[in-house]
């Protein structure tokens, strides 16, 4: 299906910057004062809050919610299917939530069905396989608790 850019960008606030070579499907919800860098893809069932920065090369798949004031580093990989197959009639969309003020380092992979808590931080290149509590720094493969973060 081909969408005209005016249809896809109709609901994007003027205060939000979307850079070159981005694909945003028409039902995606994007808030005020966001910065979506080049080469990003955003599907329909996506909710992006206000003041969010998404760096280059990020794909945001159906079922992902990114709350206000979140930083997503370059080439972060989100997933929404725990058991992917080319054709799967029993496919279940796994929802992922990135809470307010969280930060995800470049090159990290975020498994599906996960919540990253408020003001949590994920170190670069981490593979997150379970929920991350609010105000904690997690790092590694698999990502593990490093320390509490003072906000």
Give each language-model segment a name.
Residues 71, 120-121:
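Short alpha-helix at the nucleotide-sugar/activated-sugar donor binding site of glycosyltransferases
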């Amino acid at each position: 299906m081909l969408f005209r850019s005016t249809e896809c960008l109709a609901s994007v606030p003027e205060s939000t910057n979307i850079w070159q070579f981005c694909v945003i499907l028409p039902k995606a919800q994007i808030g005020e004062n966001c910065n979506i860098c080049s080469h990003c893809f955003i599907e329909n069932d996506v909710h992006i809050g206000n003041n969010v920065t998404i760096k280059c090369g990020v794909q945001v798949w159906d079922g992902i919610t990114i709350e206000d004031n979140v930083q997503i580093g370059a080439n972060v990989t989100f997933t929404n299917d725990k058991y992917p197959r080319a054709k799967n009639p029993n496919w279940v969309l796994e929802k992922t939530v990135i809470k307010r003020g969280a930060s995800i380092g470049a090159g990290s992979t975020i498994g599906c069905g996960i919540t990253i808590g408020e003001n949590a931080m994920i170190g670069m290149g981490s593979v997150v396989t379970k929920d991350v509590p609010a105000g904690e720094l997690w790092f590694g493969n698999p990502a593990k608790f490093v320390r509490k973060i003072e906000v």
